[in-house]
Amino acid sequence: MVHIQADGARSTAVILVAAGRGERAGASSEGPKQYRRIGGKPVIVHSLLGFADLLPQATLIVVIHPDDGALLANALAPYPQLAASLTITHGGKTRQQSVLAGLRALRNQKPDYVLIHDAVRPFFDQLMLQRIIARLDDGADAVLPAIPVTDTLKRGDEGARVVDTVARSGLFAAQTPQSFHFAKILAAHEDAASAGREDFTDDAAIAEWAGLTVHLVEGSPDNVKLTVKRDLEMADARLSHNALPDVRTGNGYDVHQLVPGDGVTLCGIFIAHDQALSGHSDADVALHALTDALLATCGAGDIGDHFPPSDPQWRGAASRIFLEHAANIVRDAGGTIMNADISLIAEAPKIGPHRQIMREKLSEILGIALERCSVKATTNEKIGFVGRGEGIAAIATATVVFQGKPQ
């Protein structure tokens, strides 16, 4: 990651505007659109992490709605260092009021530059920020990232009839972060508020009204504002497509003693035998090992944590219950089970004749394709307790893919 710094000793602040309600994106249990998840993280977190990475020396001000404190705290819970670096202030009824609140929060610090950014534009990039800072360093009072309008523009009337085709030459679509010399944009905002002007749609317009020259720099086609539900869906798809695969492997091992009996249960299949496996449940050593392997992929402890042998309710229980529980934990954590592999170590009974039905049982329990389930067996060459026929051991490996981290 390349860090961007202003020229010399100039200080920089970023105001992230996140006080909107986002009605056009529709209702969601996650809250306003800046708190909805794309690529596994809330939109606002993507934006904050971007500035923290690219402008690590900048002061970060987050302007939120007074009702959104808990939403922001929850969004930042996995990022305590980032959360500790932020200054949080409450916005007003309009974006203009919210930006002014953010500017006022910087009055004591008096940074040289301030970048004002919509929290729901998480796809700004390094090159665009470099162009903005360079233009400020060159002496510009106000810098606006923008992209040329490429669509043909039509003006319509109240009857939904085209009355004019607007020449697109010289027209640009404004983006953020809109960036300024701090003292000048603060004064412009204060003057606009004193004049009762609440009709500005962006900060560059206030700068123009105040007589500042606004300089254009090249924006980014990717730096879109997430406005409606479809925007959020497309952003999530984009991040998921670009994600680095989060492939996790868990291992499990278990062993049970053989005692006199009439058969053993392995991989959920009962096999007639002159011995049985001793255990609190049905002693299915294979499913116990695989249960631990699955739990390991998401740091969820081991089988004893979830089904303690001291609990009488699990006496004689079918071990598929344990495996199903572990699989549900993995799925609830966002994981997809890709492969389950079990190696049984036993002198007897013979596993080969039952291997296929064991694989089918694993496929059924886990809800994954048969080709993703493997059962193998070997003896211990008459060595040790397994070699003496005193027990059966199992080693299991589970492969799980979780939603990846965007690049």
From Swiss-Prot:
CDD domains in the cross-refs: CDP-ME_synthetase (cd02516), MECDP_synthase (cd00554)
Example GO BP: isopentenyl diphosphate biosynthetic process, methylerythritol 4-phosphate pathway
PROSITE patterns: ISPD (PS01295), ISPF (PS01350)
Gene that this polypeptide is encoded by: ispDF
EC number: 2.7.7.60, 4.6.1.12
GO molecular function list: 2-C-methyl-D-erythritol 2,4-cyclodiphosphate synthase activity; 2-C-methyl-D-erythritol 4-phosphate cytidylyltransferase activity; metal ion binding
Alphabetical keyword list: Isoprene biosynthesis, Lyase, Metal-binding, Multifunctional enzyme, Nucleotidyltransferase, Transferase
This protein's name: Bifunctional enzyme IspD/IspF
Residues holding a divalent metal cation: D254, H256, H288
Species name: Allorhizobium ampelinum (strain ATCC BAA-846 / DSM 112012 / S4) (Agrobacterium vitis (strain S4))
Site (Transition state stabilizer): R24, K33, H280, T379
